[in-house]
Amino acid sequence: PPPPPGPPPNP
């Protein structure tokens, strides 16, 4: 399976 998504970008 594909890797999990990374963390959200900083604002």
Curated annotation (Swiss-Prot):
Keyword vocabulary terms for this entry: Hydroxylation, Secreted, Toxin
Domain of life: Eukaryota
Membrane-spanning parts: none
Subcellular location: Secreted
Entry GO MF terms: toxin activity
Annotated positions of the Hydroxyproline modification: 3, 9
Tissues in which the UniProt entry reports expression: Expressed by the venom gland.
GO terms under cellular component: extracellular region
Predominant place of localization: secreted
Function field: Toxin. Induces vasodilation in mice and rabbits.
Protein name: 1095.6 Da venom vasodilator peptide
Organism encoding this protein: Bothrops jararacussu
